[in-house]
Amino acid sequence: MAVFGVTIALLVWVATLLIVSIWKQIYSSWNLPPGPFPLPILGNIFQLDLKNIPKSLTKLAERFGPVFTLHLGSKRIVVLHGYKAVKEVLLNHKNEFSGRGDIPVFQEYMNKGIIFNNGPTWKDVRRFSLSILRDYGMGKQGNEARIQREAHFLMEELKKTNGQPFDPTFLVGCAPFNVISDILFHKRFDYNDKTCLRLMSLFNENFYLLSTPWIQAYNNFENYLRYLPGSHRKIMKNASEIRQYTLAKAKEHLQSLDSSCPRDVTDCLLIEMEKEKDSQEPMYTMENISVTLADLFFAGTETTSTTLRYGLLILMKYPEVEEKLHEEIDRVIGPSRVPVFKDRLEMPYMDAVVHEIQRFISLIPSNLPHEATRDTMFRGYVIPKGTVVIPTLDSLLYDSQEFPDPEKFKPEHFLNENGKFKYSDHFKAFSAGKRVCVGEGLARMELFLLLTAILQHFNLKSLVDPKDIDLNPVTIGFGCVPPEFKLCVIPRS
């Protein structure tokens, strides 16, 4: 029996050596960037803190340099860290790394829509969607009027709180929700509308769940975890409900479609579908249109809503910053005039605060994953086709050479010695290149106009001492999720 046990142990030992030897040969078959040696099957999972992957990537960059390789499950991942490496990948090699890396929790939508599309249609769908958004006012007068109108409704809702504590998640979030809803569907909602609140709840829950450790594990070990219970199932269910809503809106629009007079983005997409009805391989199917609308709806609501909410918490933490903003607003706009986007040219401090909020919170710290579309030589290394590429945005936003004391909230990061707004090329909160956020122009306008309107009419009041406000996100993964909080808004006049 003892001999048998020794024999089994030797066989296991030999098998282990053989597996490691084969794995080493596979691992070293490409001239990849350096990185920690991966274990078979598990890869480098033990080098990552699933509760804070961006921090783990920063530590690995300190050890292996600005370009390094990780293996997670069967995935080969190349991470770019720092301004030069990230800019080089996103701008100088934008075509080679324009693919969308695999995100298993959204596998159903990988070849549809805009955000998660890695199929042959994404370039054309993205290009056409961007042109429609521009036609409907992105960065122009049309969207400014939409935001100003919605700001008025938001101010009325804030007045109804009568200085009592409230959670800003959905109340403030209704403003960007209604702006993008008007662009997509020519529809706005009352702030207590059940459909509006339900959709925002789905957006909010998915943003949170996508940032949890379980989903970080699931997206890298999907083959082993897909059949287990977990929050990946909830995300898929929520995404399906959102898409069912956008599909219903598309079908509703189709019943009253007038090709000569499109009312909104949905109509424009449906008109393209009508043009392709005789095509053997149509690009604009009802399924693709519904996913495209869901992508725009989620991204156009949740990122701006979360940034505004985080911004309010930050301003309560730093009342001296809020006071300076009140002074600038009173001087440039006054108590009653409606803010306009061009006011930012005369309001460098507000412009700096809006940028610093986005820098400080680093909402999507590790970016969405890119993918190499072909074998590519990069800095002397070969990055094979299909490799997942992570251009870390937080490595730019928290670069201590560009932003001294990056862990501190300092509007001065975006002000020169004369108090004028100072642009930084490190500010890539919306990413860059082929996959840059299609709603960047809209989001910039919303953040400036909505935050300015709130502070024009109200003082912010925290329920706790500002020194006790915790700005740390409750979870960090896909995004940085702010802690829940309540506040009071006190009318200024």
From Swiss-Prot:
Any one of the GO CC terms: endoplasmic reticulum membrane
Pfam families reported in the protein's UniProt record: p450
EC class: oxidoreductase
Major localization class: endoplasmic reticulum
Binding site for heme: 437
InterPro entries hit by this protein: Cyt_P450, Cyt_P450_CS, Cyt_P450_E_grp-I, Cyt_P450_E_grp-I_CYP2E-like, Cyt_P450_sf, Cytochrome_P450_fam2
Gene Ontology annotations of biological process type: 4-nitrophenol metabolic process; epoxygenase P450 pathway; lipid hydroxylation; monoterpenoid metabolic process; response to bacterium; steroid metabolic process; xenobiotic metabolic process
Localization per Swiss-Prot or TrEMBL: Endoplasmic reticulum membrane; Microsome membrane; Mitochondrion inner membrane
Pathway: Lipid metabolism; fatty acid metabolism
Cofactor(s) in the UniProt record: heme
Reaction equation(s) it catalyzes: an organic molecule + reduced [NADPH--hemoprotein reductase] + O2 = an alcohol + oxidized [NADPH--hemoprotein reductase] + H2O + H(+); (5Z,8Z,11Z)-eicosatrienoate + reduced [NADPH--hemoprotein reductase] + O2 = 19-hydroxy-(5Z,8Z,11Z)-eicosatrienoate + oxidized [NADPH--hemoprotein reductase] + H2O + H(+); (5Z,8Z,11Z,14Z,17Z)-eicosapentaenoate + reduced [NADPH--hemoprotein reductase] + O2 = 19-hydroxy-(5Z,8Z,11Z,14Z,17Z)-eicosapentaenoate + oxidized [NADPH--hemoprotein reductase] + H2O + H(+); (4Z,7Z,10Z,13Z,16Z,19Z)-docosahexaenoate + reduced [NADPH--hemoprotein reductase] + O2 = 21-hydroxy-(4Z,7Z,10Z,13Z,16Z,19Z)-docosahexaenoate + oxidized [NADPH--hemoprotein reductase] + H2O + H(+)
GO molecular function: 4-nitrophenol 2-monooxygenase activity; arachidonate epoxygenase activity; enzyme binding; heme binding; Hsp70 protein binding; Hsp90 protein binding; iron ion binding; long-chain fatty acid omega-1 hydroxylase activity
Record keywords, A-Z: Endoplasmic reticulum, Fatty acid metabolism, Heme, Iron, Lipid metabolism, Membrane, Metal-binding, Microsome, Mitochondrion, Mitochondrion inner membrane, Monooxygenase, NADP, Oxidoreductase
Activity regulation note: The omega-1 hydroxylase activity is stimulated by cytochrome b5.
Enzyme nomenclature, EC number: 1.14.14.1, 1.14.13.n7
List of residues binding substrate: 298-303
Membrane topology per record: Peripheral membrane protein
Subunit structure comment from the entry: Interacts with chaperones HSP70 and HSP90; this interaction is required for initial targeting to mitochondria.
PANTHER family: CYTOCHROME P450 2E1, CYTOCHROME P450 508A4-RELATED
Family stated for the protein in its record: Belongs to the cytochrome P450 family.
Record function comment: A cytochrome P450 monooxygenase involved in the metabolism of fatty acids. Mechanistically, uses molecular oxygen inserting one oxygen atom into a substrate, and reducing the second into a water molecule, with two electrons provided by NADPH via cytochrome P450 reductase (NADPH--hemoprotein reductase). Catalyzes the hydroxylation of carbon-hydrogen bonds. Hydroxylates fatty acids specifically at the omega-1 position displaying the highest catalytic activity for saturated fatty acids. May be involved in the oxidative metabolism of xenobiotics.
Protein name: Cytochrome P450 2E1
Native source species: Mesocricetus auratus
Upper classification of the organism: Eukaryota, Metazoa, Chordata, Craniata, Vertebrata
